[in-house]
Amino acid sequence: MGQGRDLAPLTEKGVQQAEAAAHDARLKDIKLIVSSPYTRALQTAAIISRITGAPLTIEVDLHEWIPDLTFRFSTGDEAVALCEDFNRCRGEYPVGETRRWETLTALRKRVRAVADKYAHMEGVAFVSHGMAMRTLRTMHDVGYAEIVELDYNPDMPDCVYWDE
């Protein structure tokens, strides 16, 4: 399984969701679409680009959280267990220990570095993944093809990832 899960295309329903999102009035004035390189996000971004006419660029570091930095997990159950461990540890390795998953600190640093590159621009749409986007704005869940507005500032404090 490993990283192969990131290579699956959108389902027919996913294509319909992307097309519906592309017609949302909030995207009518976008100037640039910045996408994750992972297949479903990139396919969503391409659909939005085609419908809105906005140019599309890919940012390699805008990808989803990495549940296994070795890319060797082999089952869905193993991926779920890694995610549960991440949540149990609140995204950080216990003192003196390491885990296979990417820490919240590393995820946040990676995604914010991408957002920082575009912070000076107006009308930028990021197409990425729930866990990655949750590092930029406090929110519990991000739906498929959901539009979440954010007035990003590189100096803003880190958002809350979990309810306290």
Question: Residue ranges of each PLM-predicted region?
Answer:
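Active-site-proximal alpha-helix that buttresses catalytic centers in soluble enzyme cores
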Residues: 1-56
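Phosphate-handling substructures
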Residues: 4, 8-9, 50-109, 161-162
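Glycine-rich phosphate-binding loop signature in dinucleotide/nucleotide-binding domains
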Residues: 26-29, 118-122
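Short beta-strand scaffold positions
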Residues: 35-36, 109, 127-128
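Catalytic metal-binding/acid-base residues of hydrolase active sites
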Residues: 39, 62, 131-132
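Acidic, low-complexity terminal tails and accessory targeting/binding regions
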Residues: 57-58, 64-79, 120, 134-164
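A short, acidic, amphipathic alpha-helical segment used as a generic capping/interface helix at domain edges
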Residues: 107-120
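Generic beta-sheet signal
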Residues: 120-130
